[in-house]
């Protein structure tokens, strides 16, 4: 069975690569002004793994400018690993482009562009610059702390972003990079300003080792515990997709005791015991008989997550994926990375690394369909991929991910690996979940 799955992925990637060893096989926006005089959007992506912030930014921007064809970017997205000093990265970018709208944050272990999967012990940096006659960007941010709650920070960030765009009304879509831990409250604050019908897409900033070193970037500001957003106003087509991609299993129950991000009971029974039974002991079975201590189950639980089972206003059933983080063996509770409430129905899911990798093709394809965008029409994409699912994929398979994304959308893109994902589900609205991937495409 495993060999068959490996063969499927090999055939899929091979078919994508056939006939496209040269980038000219599909047209990129900004690639040839002479061939298409109707181009209104120029996009360049660059990257670097050079040591030192100055050299890394210089190399990444040099590559980015090739796609911009002499246009000065109005907006830049920057994703990087925490191996770099993020403040110095921001300062170097702004030296090249004073006053540019700058948005981004830190990524777990690597970053993505159409050129590949970029990782190094020196650090990895990716930038995407955009100049467009049909898109207006506004970046805003806020710190979470004594002066602002997470909800207030979300409200302040989107208010500033709209102001910096210089336009009134609701944006067409919002990008978000937040500090892990308060995502639902931040989304609520954003929705207080723009309503619940504007899609919000992005992910929680990450580091390499879950040590709290993550950063969020909003123009010239760098936060450790904050939120950065981009308000996008455009007449161009927008497509998006947001999914975990796991298989839905038969085991399900109702949360009967919970608090915040901890599940104490499912169907009136200790949550850990129920989860252990559902997974046939595959996640933490060897610790199941212990009655004290805490067991971290992140790695194994990646293949056996839970999901909130939600019925939307469209009467369709949707699944909001939950990553179990640890088990408290004393009270048999499970700590997770999303807010949970009594009465919510949860269901077991299951996945393999092959399924998680193949999302690099299926999710972008759904986004193109959603936006009614043809591959040749795509200007650019922003890709979000859960860091936990990345780490579940063997290292020697990870470089297939940008091949799948790039050949599916046929355009420049930038990607980051996150500690939580936010996106819009039709019939449900904007949600925070785990172990998901998403993409926004514009064309």
Q: What residue ranges belong to the model's regions?
A:
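Extended, charged interaction scaffolds in large complex subunits
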Residues: 23-25
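Small-residue-enriched flexible segments
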Residues: 29-75, 80-85, 89-96, 100-381, ...
């Amino acid at each position: 069975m495993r060999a068959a799955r490996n063969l499927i992925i090999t055939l899929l990637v091979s078919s994508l690569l056939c006939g496209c060893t040269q980038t000219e096989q599909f047209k990129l926006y900004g690639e040839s002004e002479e061939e298409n005089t109707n181009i209104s959007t120029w996009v360049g992506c660059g990257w670097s793994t050079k040591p030192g912030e100055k050299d890394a930014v210089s190399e990444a921007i040099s590559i980015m400018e090739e796609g911009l064809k002499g246009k000065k970017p109005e907006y830049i997205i920057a994703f990087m690993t925490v191996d770099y000093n993020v403040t110095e990265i921001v300062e170097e970018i702004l030296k090249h482009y004073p006053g540019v709208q700058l948005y981004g944050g830190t990524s777990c272990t690597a970053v993505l562009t159409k050129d590949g999967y970029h990782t190094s012990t020196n650090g990895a940096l990716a930038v995407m610059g955009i100049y467009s006659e049909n898109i207006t960007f506004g970046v805003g941010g806020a710190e979470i702390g004594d002066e602002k709650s997470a909800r207030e920070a979300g409200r302040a960030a989107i208010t500033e972003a709209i102001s910096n765009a210089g336009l009134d009304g609701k944006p067409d879509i919002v990008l978000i990079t937040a500090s892990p831990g308060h995502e639902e409250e931040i989304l609520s604050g954003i929705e207080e300003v723009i309503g619940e019908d504007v899609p919000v897409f992005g992910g929680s900033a990450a580091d390499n080792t879950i040590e709290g070193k993550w950063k969020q970037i909003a123009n010239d500001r760098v936060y450790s515990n904050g939120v950065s957003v981009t308000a996008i106003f455009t007449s161009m087509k927008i497509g998006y997709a947001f999914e975990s991609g796991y298989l839905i299993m038969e085991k399900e129950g109702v949360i009967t005791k919970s608090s915040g991000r901890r599940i104490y009971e499912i169907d009136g029974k200790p949550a850990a015991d129920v989860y252990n039974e559902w997974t046939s002991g595959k996640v933490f079975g060897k610790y199941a008989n212990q009655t004290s201590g805490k067991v971290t189950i992140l790695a194994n639980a990646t293949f056996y997550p839970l999901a909130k089972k939600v019925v939307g206003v469209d009467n369709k059933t949707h699944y909001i994926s939950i990553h179990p983080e640890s088990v408290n063996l004393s009270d048999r509770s499970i700590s997770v990375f999303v807010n949970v409430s009594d009465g919510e129905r949860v269901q077991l899911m299951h996945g393999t690394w092959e399924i998680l990798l193949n999302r690099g093709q299926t999710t972008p394809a759904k986004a193109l369909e959603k936006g009614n965008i043809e591959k040749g029409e795509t200007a650019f994409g922003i890709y979000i991929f859960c860091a936990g699912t990345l780490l579940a994929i063997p290292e020697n398979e990870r470089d297939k991910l940008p091949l799948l994304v790039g050949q599916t959308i046929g355009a420049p893109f930038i990607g980051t690996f996150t500690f939580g994902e936010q996106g819009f589900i039709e019939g449900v609205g904007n949600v925070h979940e785990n172990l998901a991937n998403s993409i926004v495409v514009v064309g």
